[in-house]
Amino acid sequence: THRVLTTPVPAPKDLLGKFEPVFEVAALPLQAGNESQVRAQFIERLRSQGQSVPMFGLALKNDSNYYLLTLRESHRPTASASPRDRLDVSLLQQHVIATLCPSQQEQEAMLYSKDDHEALNWVRQGKVTAALLLNPTKVAEVKAVASAGERMPHKSTYFFPKPLTGLVMNVMEG
């Protein structure tokens, strides 16, 4: 589930300067008439390259770029790290959300979207200050976290269709 920020964020140059030690940053410039192609390329690169390395997408209000943030090797979790600590959503929380939203109040003001285009549209329309796109959590990652006896981070999965609660939780007596 993508994170969408409603609180102020630093100017792009300042923000990217904070991320440079931790992330390799690739900018995909937007120009008049090419947004749909650049957006498609942005999402495709996030999905394909993000399968092998921790990678996040970033869109900022009033900025003419999409950014791909690839976690540098030196900041990636080791093989001995817990399954929860190796999740993209945990890495995003540790390296990005903690920087952009240091207070609990700012984190509680965050919105969530399961749809890439919805999150990016909110930014382009000026409704929010930033969108952070993640790759979906894999079922194998959920199983690894559960097998280790850990809990999944908040809003880290989105499975559909969802079972109806009444069919699963309530005892039906005749």
State the predicted function of each range.
Residues 1-174:
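Surface-exposed, charge/polar-rich loops and edge strands
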